[in-house]
């Protein structure tokens, strides 16, 4: 039991840190765009232009 607990703890900690960073960055970006209507309109147009594969690849590399 002790060994299992230690292992899960270390794993969860590393995962939690990574998830926390990603979430905070996304949340901040959403807030800024939501406040101004101009930004939201621009973002919608850009998203439609980009292909899904390209967008996902860029997101993965950045974060």
Swiss-Prot record:
Transmembrane segments: none annotated. Testis. GO terms for biological process: chromosome condensation; sperm DNA condensation. Keywords: Chromosome, Developmental protein, Differentiation, DNA condensation, DNA-binding, Nucleosome core, Nucleus, Spermatogenesis. It is found in: Nucleus; Chromosome. It comes from the Eukaryota. Residues 1-63 are annotated as: Disordered. GO terms for molecular function: DNA binding. Its main location: nucleus. The keyword Transport does not apply. The keyword Nucleus applies. GO terms for cellular component: nucleosome; nucleus. PROSITE patterns: PROTAMINE_P1 (PS00048). Protamines substitute for histones in the chromatin of sperm during the haploid phase of spermatogenesis. They compact sperm DNA into a highly condensed, stable and inactive complex. Belongs to the protamine P1 family. This is Sperm protamine P1. It comes from Sminthopsis griseoventer. The gene is PRM1.
């Amino acid at each position: 039991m002790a060994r299992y607990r230690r292992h899960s703890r270390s794993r969860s900690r590393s995962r939690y840190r990574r998830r926390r960073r990603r979430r905070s960055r996304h949340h901040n970006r959403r807030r800024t765009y939501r406040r101004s209507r101009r930004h939201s309109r621009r973002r919608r147009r850009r998203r439609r232009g980009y292909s899904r594969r390209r967008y996902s690849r860029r997101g993965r590399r950045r974060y």
